[in-house]
């Protein structure tokens, strides 16, 4: 089992020196990977219905200060030496396919093969309207075409591709990524996301707290995983070809223990409960879990990273 942490790249903690210190602390503490999120621009007024919070609230005023995901990942390749760099997740339609493939390959080379490409189709229409030339309603199909283009450019010399959204003929992309294949973790919890993971993913990378597709209890996660394995087999792959992972936005006392299905919510309760949840997910084959140590100050983030490592992860 690998354990990661979300690195703040927006708001008050996004100053470069703070980001570097938090990343360095995570590396020194023995975490396996860090994650960075992706938004290019944000609307002045948030659209309602953010799926990963109970209230639908998405961002605060200081979230407008936000580093571009791939740029910060390249910078982190230079300020870390061991941590894997996980994109959590890259909104695939936001960047042209060939440009994104080149940038991702470059980051993998600069990091010595430490990049993991978490991907998603996106959800914020106002952001799409500002930066994407393809229609918001077609984002799933665009994402699938772009992923296929990434794979071809990374793994084939002079590939040819002719799809609805990507066309090129015998392009040469060098250098190739260090990793072959460059791992793709498919985010999302919906039916289309599961089908995408089944077709393209090296791992499935869901957040448990999506209010529209909850995976916040052990039975719910088991059902999602069973569905993924059915879809993976239907896609012509071995059922367990896609490694399951899990993203934790809140935990412990910050999380209500009783969801709508009457079961105990994963990662609610005390430290012993959280250790038990990690073991339960490990028994299902989960290979990686990351936690969001969101706190108002750098000192508080680092203190929780240290404390959580001692209280919980050291007992797994």
Feature map (PLM): residue ranges:
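Active-site-adjacent structural elements that line small-molecule/cofactor binding pockets in enzymes
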Residues: 1-316
């Amino acid at each position: 089992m690998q354990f990661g942490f979300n690195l703040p790249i927006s708001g008050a903690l996004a100053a470069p020196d703070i980001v570097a210190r938090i990343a360095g602390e995570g590396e020194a503490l023995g975490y396996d990977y860090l994650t960075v999120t992706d938004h290019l621009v944000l609307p002045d007024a948030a659209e309602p219905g953010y799926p990963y919070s109970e209230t639908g609230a998405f961002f605060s005023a200081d979230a407008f200060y936000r580093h571009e995901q791939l740029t910060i990942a390249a910078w982190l390749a230079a300020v870390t030496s061991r941590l894997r760099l996980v994109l959590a997740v890259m909104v695939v339609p936001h960047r042209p396919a060939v440009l994104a493939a080149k940038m991702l390959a470059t980051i993998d080379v600069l990091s010595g093969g430490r990049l993991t490409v978490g991907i998603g189709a996106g959800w914020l229409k106002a952001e799409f309207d500002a930066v994407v030339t393809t229609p918001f309603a077609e984002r799933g199909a665009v994402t699938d075409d772009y992923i296929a283009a990434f794979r071809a450019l990374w793994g084939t010399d002079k590939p040819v591709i002719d799809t609805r959204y990507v066309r090129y003929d015998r392009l040469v992309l060098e250098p190739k990524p260090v990793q072959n294949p460059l791992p793709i973790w498919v985010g999302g919890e919906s039916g289309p996301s599961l089908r995408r993971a089944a077709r393209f993913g090296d791992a499935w990378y869901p957040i448990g707290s999506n209010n529209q597709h909850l995976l916040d209890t052990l039975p719910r996660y088991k059902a999602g995983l069973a569905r993924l394995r059915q879809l993976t087999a239907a896609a012509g792959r071995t059922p367990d070809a896609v490694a399951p992972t899990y993203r934790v936005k809140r935990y412990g006392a910050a999380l209500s223990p009783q969801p709508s299905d009457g079961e105990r919510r994963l990662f609610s309760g005390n430290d012993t409960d959280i250790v038990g949840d990690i073991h339960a997910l490990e028994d299902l084959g989960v290979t990686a879990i990351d936690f969001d140590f969101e706190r108002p100050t750098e000192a508080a983030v680092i203190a929780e990273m240290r404390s959580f490592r001692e209280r919980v992860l050291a007992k797994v």
